[in-house]
């Protein structure tokens, strides 16, 4: 058991080291931070969606924006489209599960907002449809994806694809990236500038 535990920890570290060592990922994260900062400066909001563990990540990241990450500061508008069971089940029943995020993007999204769709496989149909609807409205779309980015990468403005085939490692990297984004956005907007 000890060897298995150590192997899992090493695997997690290796996935993150791939991101750290490839300057492309650092630049992509920086671009995402800048997009979110610009949206907030313009009085816009961030919408987030995902399935399963990615739904939990959506809620986690939204909570960091609305409550706080490190600093006591003004709340930032962020909505996880995964939390209203009445809306989710109504859309799933009356339309289809594939439409659960698309309909909410149509209802809550405004031009200039940001949508972060999270999918470890990159092949979540409901994320693809949410991205398509967001583009119709004029919402900037960001994908936190895994594996090869799947179909989702073709429908978002900024796909960030974690370089791993292992779902748990992708999920761990997604929440790490979410934390980095929240941390820098908060610092930049509320007086603690981050060094280049």
Swiss-Prot record:
Keyword Metal-binding tagged: yes
Q: How is the cofactor bound?
A: Binds 1 zinc ion per subunit.
Q: What is its main location?
A: cytoplasm
Q: Which GO terms describe its molecular function?
A: carbohydrate derivative binding; D-sedoheptulose 7-phosphate isomerase activity; zinc ion binding
Recorded source organism is Clostridium acetobutylicum (strain ATCC 824 / DSM 792 / JCM 1419 / IAM 19013 / LMG 5710 / NBRC 13948 / NRRL B-527 / VKM B-1787 / 2291 / W)
* Biological role: Catalyzes the isomerization of sedoheptulose 7-phosphate in D-glycero-D-manno-heptose 7-phosphate.
- Recorded protein name is Phosphoheptose isomerase
Q: Tell me the cofactors it needs.
A: Zn(2+)
What other note does the entry give for this protein? The reaction produces a racemic mixture of D-glycero-alpha-D-manno-heptose 7-phosphate and D-glycero-beta-D-manno-heptose 7-phosphate. Is probably involved in the capsular polysaccharide (CPS) biosynthesis.
What this protein catalyses is:
2 D-sedoheptulose 7-phosphate = D-glycero-alpha-D-manno-heptose 7-phosphate + D-glycero-beta-D-manno-heptose 7-phosphate
Q: Where in the cell is it found?
A: Cytoplasm
Q: What are the recorded Gene Ontology BP terms?
A: carbohydrate metabolic process; D-glycero-D-manno-heptose 7-phosphate biosynthetic process
Checking Gene3D superfamilies in the record gives: Glucose-6-phosphate isomerase like protein, domain 1 (3.40.50.10490)
Q: Which GO terms describe its cellular component?
A: cytoplasm
What is the main EC category here?
Answer: isomerase
């Amino acid at each position: 058991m000890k060897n298995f535990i150590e192997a899992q920890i090493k695997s997690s570290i290796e996935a993150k080291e791939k991101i750290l060592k490839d300057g492309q990922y650092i630049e992509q994260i920086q671009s995402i931070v800048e997009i979110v900062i610009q949206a907030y400066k313009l009085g816009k909001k961030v919408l987030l969606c995902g399935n399963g563990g990615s739904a939990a990540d959506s809620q986690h990241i939204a909570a960091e924006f609305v409550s706080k990450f490190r600093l006591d500061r003004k709340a930032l508008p962020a909505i996880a489209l995964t939390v209203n069971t009445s809306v989710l089940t109504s859309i799933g029943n009356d339309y289809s599960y594939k439409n659960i995020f698309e309909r909410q993007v149509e209802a809550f999204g405004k031009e200039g907002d940001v949508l972060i769709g999270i999918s470890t496989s990159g092949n979540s149909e409901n994320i693809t449809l949410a991205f398509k609807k967001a583009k119709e409205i004029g919402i900037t779309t960001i994908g936190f994806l895994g594996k090869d980015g799947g179909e989702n990468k073709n429908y978002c403005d900024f796909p960030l694809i974690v370089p791993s085939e292992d779902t748990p490692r992708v999920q761990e990297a997604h929440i790490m990236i979410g934390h980095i984004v929240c941390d820098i956005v908060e610092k930049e907007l509320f007086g603690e500038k981050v060094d280049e």
